[in-house]
Amino acid sequence: MDLSSRLSSGSSRIPKRHRDYRDEEPRRERGSGGIGREDPRGHYGSERPRRRRRDESDFRRHRESRERSYREDERPRRERRYDDYEPRSLRYSSVGRSRSPPPSRERSVRSIEQELEQLRDVTPINQWKRKRSLWDIKPPGYELVTADQAKMSGVFPLPGAPRAAVTDPEKLLEFARSAEGSIIAPPPPLQPGASRQARRLVVTGIPNEFVEDAFVSFIEDLFISTTYHKPETKHFSSVNVCKEENFAILEVATPEDATFLWGLQSESYSNDVFLKFQRIQNYIVPQITPEVSQKRSDDYAKNDVLDSKDKIYISNLPLNLGEDQVVELLKPFGDLLSFQLIKNIADGSSKGFCFCEFKNPSDAEVAISGLDGKDTYGNKLHAQFACVGLNQAMIDKSNGMAILTELAKASSQSIPTRVLQLHNLITGDEIMDVQEYEDIYESVKTQFSNYGPLIDIKIPRSIGTRNSGLGTGKVFVRYSDIRSAEVAMEEMKGCKFNDRTIVIAFYGEDCYKANAW
């Protein structure tokens, strides 16, 4: 038989495929069960039997799975186990664990109570003590001043540029509140007592057994015991002590507070210990802005005696003189703008000194000349200006650009001292490393010793100090004479250290000794 006839006869005997594969096997056996009849497909490797067997196997698996699902549907549903809520990694972990019954309600409540008990001593997040940071903290007096207006003050020059002037933030008030200044930013209120020099005093006669808490109470009592004090007002700010020379740098809240203590001259601190109050070096006289002047009343009794270059201090007044009698002494010299006689709040007796200000500034010098040394009821009066130091010139606000020009031309009146302060030389992170701190110290010492003999160098660090962060990033150098400090300032202007242009300025020696940065 030829090949074509075999294929035709064999194919005619192949049973037709049925939709239901369960009947496939019997039909195939009946069609191929004859004697001498062979399935011609077996000789030529047909894939149909293999495919059929694979389909039957898949069907059996499908049928068994379906029957299983039927049986599971008839089975009663089990309760959800407690560990079904556990993460998948725990439920299917290879680590064996013992099956335990689901916890009871009492057990859950008890465990929650134990957890709450452990949290009783935890400090609430709103009471956490945050680490002191100087980021986004503006200098005193500049809290409501924009960066553009602060730059115009001349206090913050660009690195390498000479400092335009020693000035207070109130110097900006005329420009900031003018029409020209409002173009840059809305006019913010400036604090007249921003200068730290105006709020600091040198307190001499500090005892060796100095206790800060007792000193703070003593200072506050000096205010509270007099009519100068206003209710619910705190006056003390900070103190830095130089025990080697028995003095301290006291900082109070306002310039008027500092002038009040200065007017006391000296006070008994303890047995045979008297403290004296003096102005610091480079004291800056505060200004009274035109806006503040316009708000003052024509009645001198309603105005506070603000610190200014025209404020007068009169001491050694007879203790039996009242306010009206002292005012009568002052009226011949001009109309008063403000007046305050300091009295004891306990009995109303006079402390023997007063502050005043005339409406016409020229009357102040006339009054001082007429009152100083005058005999009054057996006492020789002493009259002088209360605020004597570096004065700041008021700037005309007629033209905005003219104001900027005047600020740029303003010359520094800083008094030369033996101490130089260096800005932009180091960062706080650099001096945290001990080795790097020593390297910077030696580098500064080597460079600045070229201009004269050095006494010492101070690089403030915030490690373990009470005033954390104050002075960090600055370097202070003290020479044996003022001339060497002046030469060093001229020679080192604009120099760079570690690719940073340093800025140099004089610093008060009294604050340097007391570490009052």
UniProtKB/Swiss-Prot annotation:
Q: Name one GO biological process term.
A: spliceosomal complex assembly
Q: Which organism is it from?
A: Schizosaccharomyces pombe (strain 972 / ATCC 24843) (Fission yeast)
| Record function comment | Necessary for the splicing of pre-mRNA. The SF1-U2AF59-U2AF23 complex has a role in the recognition of the branch site (5'-UACUAAC-3'), the pyrimidine tract and the 3'-splice site at the 3'-end of introns.
Subcellular location(s): the record lists: Nucleus
Note down the stretches annotated as region Disordered. 1-112
**GO MF annotations, alphabetized:** mRNA binding; poly-pyrimidine tract binding; pre-mRNA 3'-splice site binding
Which Pfam families does this entry report, sorted A to Z? RRM_1 (PF00076)
List compositional bias (Low complexity) regions by residue number. Answer: 1-13
Which SUPFAM superfamilies would you find in this protein's record? RNA-binding domain, RBD
Which intervals carry biased composition (Basic and acidic residues)? 20-89
**RRM domain segment(s):** 310-388, 418-509
- Asked if the Swiss-Prot or TrEMBL record annotates the protein with the keyword Nucleus, the reply is yes
Q: Which domain of life is it from?
A: Eukaryota
Q: What GO CC annotations are associated with the protein?
A: commitment complex; nuclear speck; nucleus; U2 snRNP; U2-type prespliceosome; U2AF complex
**Keywords noted in UniProt:** mRNA processing, mRNA splicing, Nucleus, Repeat, RNA-binding
Keyword match RNA-binding = yes
Protein name (record): Splicing factor U2AF 59 kDa subunit
Consequence the record notes for mutating residue 387 to Y: Temperature-sensitive
